[in-house]
Amino acid sequence: MCNGGLVAYWNMDRTVAFGDEKAVIESVNNRRDVIHGHFKIVDGVSGKGIKFDGFTTRVICKASDAPHFKGAFTVEAWIAPQAYPWNWCAIINQEENHEKGYFFGIDELGHVGLHLSLDDEWIQCTTKKRVPFMTKWSHIAATFDEEEGITVYIDGMEEASLSCSGNLCFAENTDLQIGRNLTLLPPAALVRPHVSFPASYSFDGIIDEVKIYDRKLSAKEVMESYLRSKPKIMRPPLKWRKLPKLPHTGKFGAFYTKLKFYEEWDELWRVGDHPDVVVNFEEPFHMVFWRGTNFNMNLVTENGRWVGDQSAEGGGGEVIGCCEHMSDKQCRYAHVRIIENNDARVVVHWRYALCDVLYNISSKDPVTGWGNWADEYYTIYPDGVAVRHFIIHGRDPGYSITEPTVINQPGERAEDNIFLEAVTIANLEGDIRTYSWENWPGPGGVGEGFYNPVSNPTLCMLNLKSRYKPFYIYEPGTRIIPYGGGVLELRREYSHFPTWNHWPVSQIPSDGRYALAPDRVSSSAILSPMPPMRRNERGDLEGRFIMGLSNKKIEDLIPLNRFWLNSPELEILKGNFVKESFSRDEHAYIIRRENGENGALEFTLDASEDSPAVNPAFVIKGWGYGGAKMRINGETLKPSGNFRFGHRRSVNPRDLVVWIRGEFIEPVKISLIPVEMT
């Protein structure tokens, strides 16, 4: 037995009431130490342990009750990290600003260290060996002796030592804290070191059997302690975190919901029951606007692979780092709402500010106080085709807008979700080329393009490991390049693709942190397309492109590409109607009724192979409250999966929205006959 000199012991078996709070029992002194934040009691190595949430959990022992020692001491604990911390995270610490006291914990890669103040110098002793996350319990211990120095152990074995001598400068007026730093640290592995702010986080995982001795245990005693308390089952009761489950109804339409991620993360959010929007389709995929990605639209495949995107990014003024939706960690500015939701289409509005991680909005006007904001409208059709129409309310000379990004679950790297032959690009002429990330597919400098690029590209596909794959259609003049940061942000030892974990879902104040392990949700940017933007009459920048999911080959999407960019002429043959335009913003023909007569509409589309009509949509303004019967080349179609209509509410008589499933490469006559609706 090695309990001689034991001065504090938290077995973490249970919590007890302590006034209005909860407490854990320190059994040597039979004392109650308050536990703060969100936590769970789970199976430990012996009896129970405490699952710390990674955000708020900490056990506090008041300074007056904490063990006081001027010389030798030992600390030990059993831990099972769910994820590595953002930087060093204390298992036990009683220190002041790294000037007094001691700190015992693990770092962002799972190294174990004892740090302390010796003769007013902060000394660190850290292992080269790492404790694993998710898969195994680890026993960690460290000893200090004022003559011999520091020794650190993992699973009973010495893994690091530092010869040093001197007087321990004890932080006697500071509370002892378990599971959380007393001195906040910025995240490690930052992309931009100047965007470095102290982060508030706790240990993320299970802590059990915490002990402090007022003497140095020998190596033999540390091994005995490990063997005596070693559990029969070394795998801790941890489950891999998964992105939200998405209900599939098999019916096209949008709905508000509150998507669940994992309990500790969900607990943070001060939101109601309907913050998120999910769009269902007959096919087994989804489009998802979730607060965990700050409400950008995610394309989610039939097997649960997520692809997100960038927002408008840019601006200056009194801001630090990137100003974009990713920096709005708590969604203080970003929100979504459903504008249209009928059988023919869904329209979702996303509004957000271009802010930094301190929530400062970029390029604030000194007179009005308004900075950079953006509105985006996603017009979504039953075939999985959506138009992203963006309006950037800013006066800066330029903004980026899109970076198709693979979102990786904990336990995954990008290679688990996308093939190394990651991108296929095409143009209207049918030139097609696939690019591999086995080696970077271009020179690799910031903003540099592909080797052997496709000329005048307007179509690309991400080659996900799924049946349905994300695709994008752009207007002429778009430059499609590999991720714009190039190899500067690539860590080849980790992945073929640049990968970060400051976004999504993360709550740390960081605009860029490299993923060091597959312990958290991470994102891997694949492309940085640059679609054209133009100033509208108000001076706002405006643009659009198509994004969607399809199980077709890229060559089979070229007709859709041609339709959006070179839609066939529409000619009114019958009825008091006027053609306004083909709107790329809505991916639809806009037709207006000229007077209040409730008559039929007949028109032709002059379709051809160069100018086809692929699953066309029509918005008939002022149609009224009635439905419609459709004839195509004289043949009547009943409302079904191939002919859908719905109404768009407006101040004036309702507008009719019609969608047809079909590909037309020859002229076609279409009739819409009013039908009274009951």
Where are the language model's segments positioned?
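Extracellular glycan-associated modules
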Residues: 1-236
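Secretory/extracellular carbohydrate-interaction modules
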Residues: 80-88, 268-272, 330-339
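Beta-strand-rich N-terminal accessory domains
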Residues: 236-313, 458-487
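Extended, loop-rich substrate-binding clefts of extracytoplasmic carbohydrate-active enzymes
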Residues: 318-389
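Acidic (Asp/Glu-rich), glycine- and aromatic
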Residues: 365, 385-427
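Surface-exposed beta-strand/loop patches in extracellular or lumenal glycoproteins
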Residues: 402-407, 459-466, 473-477, 484, ...
